[in-house]
Amino acid sequence: MKNCYQKAFQVFFLLSITSSLSFGQAKWKPITQQTKPWSRWWWEGNAVNPKDLTYNMETYQKAGLGGLEITPIYGVKGQEANFIDFLSPKWVEMFKYTLNEGTRLGLGIDLANASGWPFGGRWVTPEDACKNVNFKTYQLKEGEKLLELITFQQSPLLRYVLPKKTEISALKYPISKNDNLQELAIDQIKYEKPLPLQTLMAYSDKGEVMNLTDKVSAMGQLNWEAPKGNWTLYAIFQGWHGKMVERAGPGGEGDVIDHFSEKAIQHYLKEFDKAFANTDVSSMRAFFNDSYEVDDARGQSDWTDDLFKEFQQRRGYDLRNYLPNLFSKENTDLNHRVLFDYRTTIGDLILEKYTGEWAKWAHGRGKIVRNQAHGSPANTLDLYGLVDIPEIEGTDLLRIKFASSASNVLGKKLTSSESATWENEHFLSTLSDVKKALDLFMVGGVNHIFYHGTNYSPKNEAFPGWLFYAAVHFTPQNPFWKDFATLNHYVARTQAFLQDSKPNNDVLLYFPITDRLTEPSPKGLLEHFDGVTPEFNGTDFKASAQKMIDRGYGFDFISDKQIANLKTQNQQIITGGVAYKTVLLAESEQVPLETLEKLVQLAKAGATIIVHHKLPTDVPGLGNLDERRAKFKALLAQLNFVKVNAQLNQAKIGEGSFLLGEDLDELMIYAKIYRETMTDKGLQFVRKTSAKGNYYFVNNKSEQAFEGLVKLEAEANSAALYNPMTEVLGMAKVKNNEVFLQLSVGESCIIETFKTVEKGKSYPYWKASKEAEELKGTWKISFIDGGPTLPKAIETQTLGSWTNAGNAYQDFSGTALYQLNFVKPKTNAQGYWLDLGKVAESASVTLNGKYLATLLGPTYKVFVPNTLLKNQNKLAIKVTNSMANRVIALEKEGTVWQKFYNINVSARLKQNLGKDGYFTTKGWSPRASGLLEKVSLTPVEVLK
């Protein structure tokens, strides 16, 4: 079979090649606790004990994990006697034991700052709980008095996860007084109660505004007669949003805090100070905050006690004078400006009063913070910028880049990811699927992988153990755990490079949040920012970002606040200790005055600013509008554009210039910004700066194997090549700044470039010298690990799914050993590709007693040196399938494995939803398992 290749071989090639050896300039970096992948570690019901904690942690450590983030969540039914309340003395004792074991085993420990998410719990009072705004309007004419009492009765609301009828009238107030919150699994609750009046404002048809709040009695009676004109009265009442902590464990159930209130977060965190007051938790690394999901509920948490005060201090005018504009549905410029100012104030409060206070609290206790900012009604770039480790999740590369952009722009060392959150339906995700997800994160700038996730489960718990409702199930009960270490070693080797480097991107893409904050939303007053989609669908911002991804331009997003700290040096833009070549504005309509002032200042100092399509036209917001608008127009007037060519105009200013044009590629070329053309060939990458040159992490995302030269924009007079999966390394073929690569589907490599000509052992490239030869004979298949039982061994001369052998084989999940004796091929060669064909799902290969490789897919090939083959050969392949078939069997026999409080395992796909509202495998057929196609050897020779 021609062009049958995969870079490298496993563990050895003639000489033993391991991570401890290096060839010339090619050398693996040290593996540390931090370079290894970590995992979210769910403590269900906090029902942990020292013996099983040790068992679990030792198992994780042996599999190659570097650390764990403890997130206590809902419990397991039947384990109530073992439940431990979050932050109780017993819980702190178990946490301290875990820290000690982590130190012994070399496992780092982070802790979620809540039992579930968002921040909240039983100790959160109604005063500190998340709020919302409610309003009523009244109409009066001259001489009229309002007879109606100014009151607002909050309507009752009860949303819960469990399909169980619960009457709100049976629940005590406040919610923390109820003892059965674990069973109730309440998601949101609003009690029927009168709401306090915050303000009463009157607006005449002539533009007059009056504050009538002090004219309202305690009973709600307004003592006021309308003067001349027609008057509209707005009464503002502060209510309770009612959001409860999601997936909370025992002791952690309760109200979510007000994320806009400094006193709320301070009161909340005091509970942790109290719990840890007499305990040494110095070995703990970080506190963690999950994504902002306060508004995953009915309505929005859109208010706080002192919003009017904060608004006036920050925006320079009284919001109470513009309540009709804030709540209006009409699309007018004034309404949009007031809405912008309201949303900006909310964003400021989350940034300063919540995220900032949380980080300050943690730092004061010697801890760092990891934060998921996505989903917040604020500029996520700024929220990420306040924390030590920004964390992202998802499968959209543009979304991923928000967290890494903040790290890159502000000089942070680590960007983490909640990885493979729900890669496939339960029990179907493979290690190959996970690797694909991890590669995307690393291409997006992530260098600190966290799996989502791993359940604490007692050693003797029956299959499938304790599980989380939405996960790949990185747990020892999953058969793929046997091969999990292979993936973890791959991640560790890759992250060792990605952590020991600095970002190397050319473009700072301005995040035009102003345009979104100005636009009303049918969902409510707030606008949440989760990424680029769907918030920026149809915008040039999204189109330009995607084009830069597709065309191979390195870029980071940047916010207004971050632009304020940029500097120009040698015609480059400096931030976070790294240099960029330009700031790109992609058809932004409104830009803050301060941002335009800074961009002009940068250009005057020698920078190049690129504007795609058109310049911004106005400033946002209402405060001091005329003065700001005049200054804005004066700045634009300084930009005197001259046509350079049909595609491009330039305005020189000071030592630099603004470039304006329709064609993004033309603008980049004129600014001397050049793309990495490897993206044209189906390759994706991230480029980093190393001590001696650059690193490229390159992944073949296409459906075809790649072989050929790849032009690099970084200077490469020589280059080292590393395969982090196979551990093969050596000096690459380089010609005219082009590096020769061979990448199978889904395969990755690391290129290290040097500005000088470095010498060393060459990287081995292989090409097929003859056609593939099928390995024929009698295969013996023995079932060696798994369940529910170990089926009898079988023999076959034709490979196919072992589920075809009968019911016992259909029910089996685990590992089977395939053994074959074969004669050495007649064709002599320098080596051979052993191709397993299609495999379900992973395979560990041994030949003549020598371990070769563990193959995760999607390509199942391994290099065999000719010195290993004998006249008579013994091939042994351990194939591991998924959990699915055993779970299917459990359901068929009526065994109850879904025994969890709260959500109790939900379906990712609707077709897998049972009548009870839970996930089910009913209707599933057994999944194909084992070696599914012929196995072959292909003679290969060195490609010169």
Report residues per predicted region.
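Bacterial Sec-dependent N-terminal signal peptides
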Residues: M1-A26
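Mature N-terminal, pre-catalytic/accessory segment of carbohydrate-active enzymes
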Residues: S22-K274, N278-M284, L931, T938-K944
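Carbohydrate-binding surfaces of carbohydrate-active enzymes
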Residues: W38, W43, N49, T54, ...
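An acidic-aromatic loop/edge-strand motif
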Residues: W117-G120, V124, Q139-E142, L158-K193, ...
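Short aromatic-centered micro-motifs
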Residues: A202, I573, A651, A843-G849
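Exposed aromatic-hydrophobic patches
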Residues: Q221-W224, E738-L741, K861-T867
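C-terminal structured "cap/appendage" subdomains that terminate the fold
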Residues: Q571, A586, E594-E597, V611, ...
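Aromatic-lined ligand-binding clefts that engage carbohydrates, nucleic acids, or primary amines
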Residues: F822-N848, L855-L856, L875-V879
